[in-house]
């Protein structure tokens, strides 16, 4: 009977061992499941943190880009304003120079007219006093007066920029070539 007892005890031991093994496997499975859930939670937390960081970086990049855009617009506007001011100053200076040139031309024209009138009067007086002189003398005087009048006319034309370069080249040489 010993063998039957031994067999019974062996079966009993085996049953207990199997039960304990199943309990240990159950505990290991529970712990594995808990570890799995904990790992999933950690992964989700990391994913959420990464998403938040990426969103914050995206927003910061957008803010920086917007600030750069605004700064560029401000700089462009300032450059535009400066250009307009410079152009206006140049326009004003040109108008002043034009006005001064016009006044000088009018003054020169007035003086040329006076000189021409004086020459005409002088010619008239010379002609009257020299009526008795020979025709050659009168012709010579007339040519001189004509030359002086032509010189005054050319000076006025040159002042107004109406001179023909080829015609007046001998009287008013220029450095333009």
UniProtKB/Swiss-Prot annotation:
UniProt region (Disordered), positions on chain: 1-177
Extent of Polar residues compositional bias: 119-142
Domain of life here? Eukaryota
Q: Please verify whether the record's keywords include Ubl conjugation.
A: no
Spans of repeat sequence: 53-63, 64-74, 75-85, 86-96
- State if Magnesium is listed as a keyword: no
Segments for region (4 X 11 AA approximate tandem repeats of T-A-Q-A-A-K-E-K-T-Q-Q): 53-96
Give the compositionally biased regions (Basic and acidic residues).
28-39, 90-117, 164-177
UniProt lists compositionally biased (Low complexity) regions at 40-89
Q: Which UniProt keywords apply?
A: Repeat
Which PANTHER family is this protein grouped with? LATE EMBRYOGENESIS ABUNDANT PROTEIN (LEA) FAMILY PROTEIN (PTHR34191:SF20)
* Family assignment from sequence similarity: Belongs to the LEA type 4 family.
Protein name, per record: Late embryogenesis abundant protein 1
